[in-house]
Amino acid sequence: MPPKLDPSQIVDVYVRVTGGEVGAASSLAPKIGPLGLAPKKIGEDIAKETAKEWKGLRVTVKLTVQNRQAKVTVVPSAAALVIKALKEPERDRKKVKNIKHNGNISFDDVIEIAKIMRPRSIAKELSGTVKEILGTCVSVGCTVDGKDPKDLQEEINSGDIDIPNE
């Protein structure tokens, strides 16, 4: 038998969910059951927390559990932030699979997303984080200021575009 959990201990649990949907309680149970929490209630809390801003998007949710209380925090991925910046109408996830987004976001949006992602980035400088976000834009399939994100990455590398540090 595994050792009993100390209730005052703080435990972080990360779960991938679709915003605004109550995930299957069975997928939450093995992660939060041993912590003494009801998976169904936590599923509803997550759905309520993600319904407003992240409806229909896949986001990671951080559950901070202490004294049998769970605090829900949304930890969005770069792709989720880019798709949110596109401001596209929500699609039915079950009907439309592997969506290619063909919108356009401004370079200022990319810099804002890079500032949000900065603590989790591997890059040394903000310009490196901006290039990471531009790479995500390529994967999502959107353009930045009407240009291909790869061209913008080359302009940053050659020094044509200057990115402020922080």
From Swiss-Prot:
Binds directly to 26S ribosomal RNA. This is Large ribosomal subunit protein uL11x. One of its GO terms (biological process) is translation. Keywords: Ribonucleoprotein, Ribosomal protein, RNA-binding, rRNA-binding. It comes from the Eukaryota. GO terms for molecular function: mRNA binding; rRNA binding; structural constituent of ribosome. Pfam families: Ribosomal_L11 (PF00298), Ribosomal_L11_N (PF03946). The gene is RPL12C.
